[in-house]
Amino acid sequence: MTDSPADLRSAFRSGRVTPTAGLAPGFAQTNLIAVPQDWAYDVLLFTQRNPKPCPVLDVGDVGSRETVLAPGADITTDLPLYRVWKDGELADETADVSGLWRDDLVAFHIGCSFTFEHPVAAAGVPLRHVEQGSNVPMFVTNRECRPAGRMSGPMVVSMRPVPEHQVSLAAAISARMPAVHGGPVHIGDPTELGIADVAAPDFGDPVNFEPGDVPVFWACGVTPQAAVMASRLPFAITHAPGYMLITDIPDSEYVLEVPDAR
């Protein structure tokens, strides 16, 4: 029996630490970035100007640890792993940030590509990182995001090896889910994104290719963390890459209906 989102959040609250790819199939997952209220407009504008890597699914009230995406959840304890940033530098990685939370923080929940993995897998497309029990590999690219106020930085992408004959299928399925990054931003040669070695990700784990696999790159919600570093935010709390908030929202809620052509 598959654990429910609530069961998994409870396990994370109790100390279980694991990447969330492949967990609670059928339910949306989100990236988290929480910043001081003084920076919240900059972040909001940055996400609005860069919707491909930063599709916002919810913004919390100032100081709130709650989200409508997971009623009853505490976003300071119910993700498996967090990162704490000070002056743009990684200060800590911890499974509980409840003691670091501040009354002036505003939390942004950003769509995650793990959400479209369930329908992609259901269509018969293999997910190599799930098969291999690893985190998805993520890379900082040479594509700069559109700056907003004090926020700027490069786009981050996730990479999945896909059998060449199934690339168009994976692209079409994900393209119907723009709230969780939509279709790929690049297919094939990683050097066009400034990625020298797909076996050496900036975040996550390396993944092994099978014969006939092609690297496919999707915009990634770790992009705000790259902006935190580039913009040297004085303080921020984020998820650790690959360790997401598992919500109660079915992934089907984020699938665009295709108009009837008749």
From Swiss-Prot:
The keyword Heme does not apply. Its EC number is 4.2.1.-. GO terms for molecular function: lyase activity. Keywords: Lyase. InterPro entries: D-Glu_cyclase, Putative_hydro-lyase, UPF0317. Belongs to the D-glutamate cyclase family. This is Putative hydro-lyase RHA1_ro03475. It comes from Rhodococcus jostii (strain RHA1).
